[in-house]
């Protein structure tokens, strides 16, 4: 497999006319241009190709959807992509933040949609999510927030608003800051759905 993540998100990434998918080959013979069934929807931004000797050259889209080989390939690719992103988040933060600014919404949608469909995406994706920390003045992972919590703090505090100024002005934010508690700022409408879908973080 040869996969990559573009440097910037297409304008129509979250619109119905966007066609995700990976090029599919078998033994170097082209099968399909955009195989949507290979990767989960929340990785719709990933581009590239897969060349597998285990796929039939004469296979319909319906048969592809039922192909065990394709499902195994897809699961392995998903694990590899998530592992790569997790490593970037930990070791190459500036690069990861560039990725997050372009494609972070897809990860958050993946967390929320997983809750709706019964797939447990939260465990796979929770350490990839970044939110703005009021105390640290930067984007942090939930792990980083928890590691910086005060002794005895049991909850993750967050506030929702259209921008930093509007959240700063909330009485609740002021109250938490006065108690020296960190607050995560949620600016994107999907943020609140994602963080509620996570339920808890340990």
Regions found by a protein language model. Give the residues of each.
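Conserved GHKL (Bergerat-fold) ATPase module
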Residues: 1-202
């Amino acid at each position: 497999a040869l996969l990559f993540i573009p440097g910037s998100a297409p304008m129509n990434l979250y619109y119905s006319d966007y066609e995700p998918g990976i090029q599919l080959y078998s033994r170097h013979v082209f099968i399909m241009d955009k195989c949507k069934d290979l990767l989960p929807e929340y990785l719709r931004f990933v581009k590239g190709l897969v060349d597998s000797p285990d796929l039939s050259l004469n296979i319909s889209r319906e048969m592809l959807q039922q192909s065990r080989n394709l499902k195994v390939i897809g699961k392995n690719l998903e694990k590899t992509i998530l592992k790569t992103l997790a490593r970037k988040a930990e070791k190459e933060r500036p690069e990861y933040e560039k990725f997050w600014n372009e494609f972070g919404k897809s990860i958050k949608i993946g967390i929320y949609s997983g809750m709706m469909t019964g797939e447990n995406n939260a465990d796979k994706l929770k350490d990839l999510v970044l939110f703005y920390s009021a105390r640290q003045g930067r984007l942090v992972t939930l792990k980083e927030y928890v590691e910086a919590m005060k002794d005895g703090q049991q909850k993750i505090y967050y506030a929702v608003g259209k921008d930093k100024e509007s959240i700063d002005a909330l009485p609740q934010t002021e109250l938490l800051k006065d108690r020296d508690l960190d607050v995560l700022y949620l600016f994107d409408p999907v943020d609140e759905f994602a963080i509620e879908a996570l339920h808890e973080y340990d």
